[in-house]
Amino acid sequence: LLSAQVHAEDCEETQAKLTRPFPNFWGIDEHSTRFVPEESTSISAANVHRLKLKWAYGIETNSPRSYPLVTENTIFFGDSGAGLLALDRETGCVKWRHKDSRGNVASAILSRVTESGLTLYFTGRREGVFAVDATTGKTIWKATITQEPVPLYSGTPLLADGKIFVPISSEEVGLSINPFYGCCTTSGGIAAFDATTGEQLWYLPTIEEPARVIGRHFVFVEKWGPSGVPVWSAPTYDSQSGLLFLVRGKNYSDPATITSDAIFAVDADSGKRRWVRQFTEGDTFNMGCLINCPNCPDAPGPDLDFGAPPVIASNGKDQQVLYVGQKSGHVHAMDPSSGEVLWNKHLSRGGYLGGIHWGLAADEKAGILYVPISDYPSGGHSDLPAVPGMFALNLHDGSVLWKNLKDTSALDGFWPGLSPGVVAAEGLVVAGDLAGGLAAYSAEDGSVLWQFDTAKNFTRVNGVDNTGASIDSHGPLIVDDLLLVASGYGGVNMQPGNALLVFQLAQEKVDTDDSSAPEEQAHE
């Protein structure tokens, strides 16, 4: 049962308290560790078993792509069907709706204190970057790049030093399924905007060479290249060096470039590239390859690019290291100053959805790099077994400390791979999976401390039918005594759903009858 029963959809009290917004980065901090410190959460390995479902909100789209921002009494979340929402933290009622972003919200919600108060920032998949007043829900500014004709804003921006850095991909990855579309001409990139005014400060494309006609099909349809190299995910920032670190995707068309499937270091002030390190050569692939469309390159690559933001963490030897996870199932450790590879670890067969898909997490104090493995059975190294599950690596040398694999031997239902981003806190890491499972794993040995099946119907707090399904993309968030997750992700043949679920630590039961019976857990 929900601790808060069905409420009216709109709140009577709409005032948002805005002094403690969290988090302000997709990766929790500028280094993208996805580790929530003790001062920001009371959830730990000792009490995570007390998590209970507080309320469920019915999203108006069946493929939620947002990651929440939480304050003292408000949850800001992007419902692509309704736009950015300000929800009451206690009941889930709606304080305001930002209708300008309806149908578009695609990122985590970020915030920054300005002269007029708290400003929220996020991207719409096709509309660009929004700056919104957190008190009123009114648009302050909206900006798009002009350098590319069909940009796609699929990654979360990063706020630093009065600027907002926006990753850019391209709609051509999907347009390529149209055999009469001349694929492809566009490049991914990263753009910097003034966070106060929305003025574009610089733009760095991932491909500097302009596209040219490289052939034809159907006699008259021109084939173009090079193209692609999208930036799917949030940048990582190191304020000491002033460098942004970006992961790059595949080329959409021939010829392949040295910038695809690569890691970039970029000067945050100038937008100049500092170094680039490519890991997979010749990876040219687009959605047309899935249906034998003539826009597919003549010799398509494996589509084993990078989707997870880089992580900066200490390796326990007083050295800052850049850790990146690839869809191929590899983890690479690099020197952030030069791009030199320190070590790499091949964990799994990989595939179109990973391998490592959306994100890693790092607990520097424990010396652990958490690596979720999807190994969705499509693409990848077919000669290797699939090993979906959670891996814990030693930050120093990449050795496996422990692993907890999903049992797929008698699979009855959807693939339970760990594709979404994960989040860690003291003594634990929390991960969702493509079958709708949500679990907290012990940092010590990987044992499951708490679990919950989100792939079902929920009693809703608003007027929208509410069903959980695949968990993907941004994954769960831990803040204060809450755990939040969007369940249902209808992209790439996954199970669609529309539930925003909010869990809360229940009060510890007082033993009044001297019984030794264990407390009932909130798992199913």
Task: Enumerate the language-model features and the residues they cover.
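Surface-exposed loop and turn segments in beta-propeller and other repeat-based domains
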Residues: 144-147, 203-225, 274-301, 346-351, ...
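Beta-propeller domains
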Residues: 46-48, 79-92
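Repeat-blade elements of multi-bladed beta-propeller folds
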Residues: 20-30, 61-83, 102-129, 149-182, ...
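Beta-propeller blade signature
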Residues: 186-198, 259-271, 387-396, 498-507
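Blade/loop signatures of beta-propeller domains
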Residues: 10-53
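A structural motif specific to WD40 beta-propellers
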Residues: 54, 93-96, 140-142, 201-202, ...
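Short loop/turn segments that connect beta-strands within beta-propeller blades
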Residues: 88-91, 133-136, 194-197, 268-270, ...
